[in-house]
């Protein structure tokens, strides 16, 4: 069985694989240099979208993590109420879990 991941946005596991590490580096670059250029907080979710993307790539790998981050970004707008939306645990989509 897969270990559940922490809901704490400060607890982000190390990404596995070169593609996941590169994507995590891109997200960290955005967080450090680009995110502060926006005026005020604009994310309606907890954790914020960049932290969600970083954690999803670190936990689920480059492909599934990117898909999860893209789905999250697609929800980010006035048409969605936002709120708490954690990264799903590994194995969430397995046939045993979804039934």
UniProtKB/Swiss-Prot annotation:
Function: Could be involved in insertion of integral membrane proteins into the membrane.
Chief location: membrane
Presence of keyword ATP-binding: no
Protein name: Putative membrane protein insertion efficiency factor
Entry keyword set: Cell membrane, Membrane
Entry GO terms, CC: plasma membrane
Organism: Corynebacterium efficiens (strain DSM 44549 / YS-314 / AJ 12310 / JCM 11189 / NBRC 100395)
InterPro entries: Membr_insert_effic_factor_YidD
Pfam families on file: YidD
Its membrane topology: Peripheral membrane protein
